[in-house]
C-alpha cells in the first residue's frame, strides 16, 4: 500500500507518482487517509510485510502493528520518539540524501528488525487516563 496522510503536503500526488513509476502497479493500493477510513488503513498496514514510512504517523502505526519499519525522517520529532522507543534499526533522513537509498531501505526487512512497543503504548494510555481524570474533575 501507499498511504497518503496529508494531501496538503503532497502525499497523494507522491503516492500516485510512485505507483505510476512502478512495474508492480497492479499490486499497489493507494489509501488516501481522510480521518474516516482509519480501519481500512489499519487493516492494510496489518497485512503488510514491511513498511517504509515517510510520515510520523506511518512510523508509529507500523511499529504498533508489530511490523518491520524503515522510517524516513523529515524532522527531529520522529528521531527523538524512535530513540525513546529504543529503535536501533536503519532509517533515512531527508536532510541527509546519502541515507536514502534502496540498499539502506531494505536492511530492516532483510534483517527482520522489529521492536516491541507494547509497554510504550500501555504507558501512553496511562497518560490519557491521568488527563481524563484531570479534565473530569
What kind of region is each of these model predictions?
Residues 1-137:
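Active-site anion-handling motifs in enzyme catalytic cores
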Amino acid at each position: 500500500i501507499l498511504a497518503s496522510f496529508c494531501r496538503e503536503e503532497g502525499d497523494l500526488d507522491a503516492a500516485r507518482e510512485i505507483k505510476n513509476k512502478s512495474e508492480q502497479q497492479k499490486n499497489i493500493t493507494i489509501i488516501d487517509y481522510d480521518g474516516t477510513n482509519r480501519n481500512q488503513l489499519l487493516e492494510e498496514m496489518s497485512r503488510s510485510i514491511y513498511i517504509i514510512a515517510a510520515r510520523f504517523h506511518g512510523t508509529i502505526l507500523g511499529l504498533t502493528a508489530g511490523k518491520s519499519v524503515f522510517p524516513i525522517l523529515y524532522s527531529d520529532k520522529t528521531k527523538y520518539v524512535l530513540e525513546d522507543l529504543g529503535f536501533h534499526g536503519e532509517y533515512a533522513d531527508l536532510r541527509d540524501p546519502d541515507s536514502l537509498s534502496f540498499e539502506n531501505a531494505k536492511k530492516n526487512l532483510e534483517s527482520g528488525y522489529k521492536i516491541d512497543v507494547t509497554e510504550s503504548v500501555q504507558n501512553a494510555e496511562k497518560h490519557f487516563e491521568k488527563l481524563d481524570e484531570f479534565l473530569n474533575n
